[in-house]
Amino acid sequence: MINGGDYFKNEILLISMATLYLWYSFRYARKTNLEELEIPTKKIIGQFLVTFLISQLFYYTGIQFLQIQSDSSASFAENISHGYSLSLMLSVSVISPIEEELFLRGFVQKGGFRNSWLGIFLTSSFFSLLHVPNDALSFIYYALSGFIYGTSYKYSKTLWVPILCHIGHNTIIVVRSFFYT
């Protein structure tokens, strides 16, 4: 890890490396015809809004009633206790969602499983494991979040919908942390 978990250390290097990695990932996805990353149409924007609304309703239900906990949320809380850094906010709200969606939905779900329901189920489970849930209920919660993103990709046929939903979701978490920490 470039910053050793300290988002203030080597902040510019971390942002530069992540930007380079994302640029290369998008380039690779386009070159291999894994995904047509064109400007989103009105239909795609509509699909994004519906999926985002569903994911946010699901998120607030999980937060209000289920007390979902994971090592990734605990790590985020620990990092912001030391203050906010640009690299932390970009990593959580933009970089990680793009990386996760390109890899899980693009490479694994579409590339490995041809966008099948089995692929959605497996990538949803892997998505949950990436967030290191602390109990079975948290695992199910994160897997269902992954299922929402995977299903949105299957029906929209573009990575823009799950990418934008995931970015929006994580950005709301970052913004909420300004007010509730």
Language-model segment annotations:
Residues M1-A29:
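Alpha-helical transmembrane segments in multi-pass membrane proteins
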Residues K31-S96:
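Juxtamembrane helix-loop-helix connectors linking adjacent transmembrane helices
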Residues M1, M17-Y21, T51-Y59, H169, ...:
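Alpha-helical transmembrane segments of multipass membrane proteins
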Residues R27-N33, E100-L104:
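C-terminal ends of transmembrane helices
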Residues S85-T181:
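Transmembrane helix-loop-helix hairpins at the membrane interface
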Residues D6-L13, S72-N79, S138-Y149:
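Non-cytosolic membrane-interface motifs at loop->transmembrane helix junctions
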Residues M1-I12, Q64, Q69-A74, V175-T181:
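Juxtamembrane/transmembrane-helix boundary motifs at the membrane-water interface
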Residues G4-D6, K31-K42, F107-R114, Y153:
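Membrane-interface helix-boundary motifs at transmembrane edges
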